[in-house]
Amino acid sequence: MILPINTYSDEVLHQKAKPLKGVDADISSLIDSMFESMENASGIGLAAPQVGCSIRLLVLDVSCMKSYEDVPPMVVINPNVLAVRGKNLMEEGCLSVPGVQGDVLRPSEITLKYRDRNFQEHTEEFSGMLARVLQHEIDHLNGTLFVDRMEKRDRRRIQQELDDIAAGLVPADYPIARECSRGGEGPACM
């Protein structure tokens, strides 16, 4: 099922998400819907708060990118960044901030502890675009958007666009939610 994407001003995007204690049928269904929603919106990553569920869950699929064709789609639950290395400035965008891009400085490599769809624990190192996408999506789980990480002068430059998104004036090629009625607590989110 394609889920609507919450946007910039929606409260659920500015809250720290709650950890998951396991994967049941509802969470498994949510994961499937998140992948479907991400693909429908031509995204490469999607965090549960973006679909109105304040839980520490994200999905990503970077296989559409030339250097990452062999990287399988990932489900990341309860991620914890253990170490970071290097720095890289790169332009980012976000399904929750449609039509806006901006430069964000992030570590170029991370060591990540997380659980997969089967709730099996992993500790892995990631670099390049995969590290960036993971950090971007993990930020969503911590109530942070990429625009919050932009330099202040760059943020001021896009403020009108952010105001337009908050006012519901920016169209997208995918379903957009107005403030999530579930508040991140509905049955699909548990």
Swiss-Prot record:
SUPFAM superfamilies: Peptide deformylase. GO terms for biological process: co-translational protein modification; translation. The active site is at residue 137. Fe cation binds at residues 94, 136, 140. InterPro entries: Peptide_deformylase, Peptide_deformylase_sf. It catalyses: N-terminal N-formyl-L-methionyl-[peptide] + H2O = N-terminal L-methionyl-[peptide] + formate. Its EC number is 3.5.1.88. Removes the formyl group from the N-terminal Met of newly synthesized proteins. Requires at least a dipeptide for an efficient rate of reaction. N-terminal L-methionine is a prerequisite for activity but the enzyme has broad specificity at other positions. This is Peptide deformylase. It comes from Chlorobium luteolum (strain DSM 273 / BCRC 81028 / 2530). The gene is def.
